[in-house]
């Protein structure tokens, strides 16, 4: 297993039952950017696509957003995100960290215009979920 204190590439996930946002980042520079949005079938991730992305980027760490209520308590999606993190840990030889994602979607919506400042950009495949994954990853990078 790779060292959590590495300076390599890290991958972040914004887990959802319909969509999973994916972002890629660099621990050395503490930067993160949205990568893609994956479709889920009834809450089941597309593991083949996740494996393909993993093989392309070879991240040293996975960071999964932990969806908590505003007061910090868990909600039904929290359990599903934890299960997703456990599955990642079982399927891939890299550490998996969970990171509080409260307000990440709100921040992603604010950042949306950074990526979609005109109609041409609005047709891009990068969606709010991928931007939220980038927000989660950037927050984790800043705290790690």
Swiss-Prot record:
The EC number of this protein is: 3.1.-.-
Primary localization class, coarse: cytoplasm
What the entry lists under InterPro entries is as follows:
RNaseH-like_sf, YqgF, YqgF/RNaseH-like_dom, YqgF/RNaseH-like_dom_sf
One Pfam family matching this protein: RuvX
Q: Which UniProt keywords apply?
A: Cytoplasm, Hydrolase, Nuclease, Ribosome biogenesis
Instruction: Kindly list the biological process annotations in GO that this record carries.
Output: rRNA 5'-end processing
Q: Does the keyword Hydrolase apply?
A: yes
* Location within or outside the cell: Cytoplasm
Gene Ontology molecular function, alphabetical: nuclease activity
Where on the tree of life does the source sit, at the highest rank? Bacteria
Q: What class of enzyme is it?
A: hydrolase
Quick check: keyword Transcription in the entry? no
Q: Which GO terms describe its cellular component?
A: cytosol
Q: What does this protein do?
A: Could be a nuclease involved in processing of the 5'-end of pre-16S rRNA.
The family line of this record is: Belongs to the YqgF nuclease family.
Q: Which PANTHER family match?
A: POLYNUCLEOTIDYL TRANSFERASE, RIBONUCLEASE H-LIKE SUPERFAMILY PROTEIN
Q: What is this protein called?
A: Putative pre-16S rRNA nuclease
Q: Species name for this entry?
A: Blochmanniella pennsylvanica (strain BPEN)
What's the name of its gene? yqgF
